[in-house]
Amino acid sequence: SHDIRIPLVSATGSTRMGKAVGAAVGRRLGRSLLELGGNNAIIISAEADLDMALIGAAFGAVGTAGQRCTSTRRLIIQEKVYNKFKEKLVNAYKQLKIGDPLNIKNHVGPLIDKDAVKMYLEAIEKCKAEGGKFIVEGGVLKGKGFESGCYVQPCIAEAKNSYGIVQHDTFAPILYLMKYKTID
């Protein structure tokens, strides 16, 4: 971002990262294109193919342990299919295999470090404090294969889009479910 030979810096990530990139590029009067703090969503309509939506939602939320800037963090589900989809999603989460990411039988690997684990746990507590209801509980996994302390349980919370934590990027496998009546 400091190199004047680079005419445009494009980055996707947290608001914090964007401020750092923006400041560095701004010092050289360069241009930047930033996509920040979006907490990607999937909107599931009453007409959606729920099995297809389930595959996309589950992979988007837990792939790379939710540590991509493009990870799915919110599911906005039409109320007529909300309970049916929620049941399918909870069942899918019960079948997730967590462990060494080099083992192709595993779906979810570790968070990058203990700081990421701390932010994951803080996000869970913030969601609960704002009124979120966890339908799949999170937590740090213990036991054989999890000695690093960086393996966590992907979790699902019923939440409201107005919650502060829902508007804040958490690079971890936390998925927020929200119900809608009409798209408007």
Question: Where are the model-predicted features located?
Answer:
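ALDH superfamily catalytic-core signature
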Residues: 8, 14-161, 179-184
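Histidine (H) residue identity feature
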Residues: 2, 103-107, 168
